[in-house]
Design a protein with these regions (language model features):
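Glycine- and Gly-Pro-enriched alpha-helical subdomains that act as flexible
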Residues: 91-139
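Charge-dense, low-complexity intrinsically disordered segments
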Residues: 8, 12, 119-122
């Protein structure tokens, strides 16, 4: 909500991004993109927040969830509380070879950034906006 307000992102644009995101995710599942990237666990085989049948009209009917008076964030256009369940295992090339692990990728570039959210000088989620361009310059 804070980022949307700070950057003047209107509700309809947030809903449009949410809609497009659901459509792209549904297509990726249909095309088998995640087949070798996801491991089913406890009966869950797909992202449980995917709504492939959603429409912009349905999204527009949802009420704001954080700032009920003036807010624009809804259950559909904000990050779900269950989002973010993932795992990345990193190891040295030497260790991977010694343990007969297949090397799938190399971490070649990284960057660190922080924002001053405590004093409300910058948005909480803005660190990647600083880090990613610097990292891409290195690449």
């Amino acid at each position: 909500q804070i980022t949307a307000r700070e950057w003047s992102i209107p509700r309809d644009e947030q809903d449009k991004l949410a809609y497009e995101s659901h459509q792209k995710l549904a297509s990726a599942y249909d095309e088998g993109f995640f087949k070798d990237l996801m491991t089913p666990l406890a009966g869950l085989e797909k992202d449980n927040i995917l709504r492939p049948d959603t429409t912009l009209e349905k999204l527009a009917t949802l009420k704001p969830v954080f700032d009920r008076e003036n807010g624009t964030m809804t259950a559909a256009n904000s990050t779900a509380l269950t989002d973010g369940a993932s795992c990345v295992l990193l190891a040295s090339e030497e260790w991977a070879k010694a343990n007969n692990m297949e090397i799938k990728a190399y971490l070649t570039f990284s960057e660190v950034a922080a924002v001053d959210f405590v004093d409300k000088k910058e948005g909480l989620l803005m660190a990647p906006a600083y880090a990613v361009p610097r990292m891409l310059e290195k690449a």
